[in-house]
Amino acid sequence: MKLAVITDSTATLPIDLKQDKAIFSLDIPVIIDDETYFEGRNLSIDDFYQKMADSKNLPKTSQPSLSELDNLLGLLSSKGYTHVIGLFLAGGISGFWQNIQFLAEEHPEIEMAFPDSKITSAPLGSMVKNVLDWSRQGMTFQAILNKLQEQIDGTTAFIMVDDLNHLVKGGRLSNGSALLGNLLSIKPILRFDEEGKIVVYEKVRTEKKAMKRLVEILNDLIADGQYNVSIIHSKAQDKADYLKRLLQDSGYQYDIEEVHFGAVIATHLGEGAIAFGVTPRL
């Protein structure tokens, strides 16, 4: 079995994985004032925040190119790849996952699977890494898919944002939920639910209380087993440091990965968002 893993630019990948010849990534366009950008190609994360601040309109995102994925699958076939696993941004907040299912029929020479990751960022990157590791350990394609589904089912993320309007205008949250939060000065805690949608989990008064509540939620989640925890933020280093300190003060003694959201996710969460991702160690 020669396996390739395809993901998208919302997955947080360390440098060694980005350079791995068996991993391929599709760029997701970010549109600012009718100009199209691709993070890492013609848009740095600092440039993104500056352009977002300067623009009168919120940025938008589009889906990765279907034709690019179709062409990539043809290329992988010509290079002798026999199996492909695609792991992309949660189907609950992007239509891309649903739109690509037909491609398996277009490339019958490759055995492929596109499970819904139901997540993004660091947990998505963890899934990509695990799939590659399991393949190189000699696991069968079906065994990898079974293990991957176990990770997907045990993975989630909780988020606190500064401005709910980004989620509303991006179609990721209802206007009613945002209106309530803004009117009452509430800091809603959001989560990725079982369908990969971003939903309101709890409403908490004040940011400080919301941060402490995030730690309580996290400790409850990881009490029953071994998990990798990541703190993810959109230009909110002070909040990330504070959340990490609260977590360590609560007794958490394991390593905590700290990363920032890329431009695509920051488009929908806005500047100042803080989150933690939880995924099982398998």
Curated annotation (Swiss-Prot):
The keyword Glycosyltransferase does not apply. PROSITE patterns: DEGV. SUPFAM superfamilies: DAK1/DegV-like. The keyword DNA repair does not apply. Keywords: Lipid-binding. Signal peptide: none annotated. One of its GO terms (molecular function) is lipid binding. It comes from the Bacteria. Hexadecanoate binds at residues 61, 94. May bind long-chain fatty acids, such as palmitate, and may play a role in lipid transport or fatty acid metabolism. This is DegV domain-containing protein SpyM3_0586.
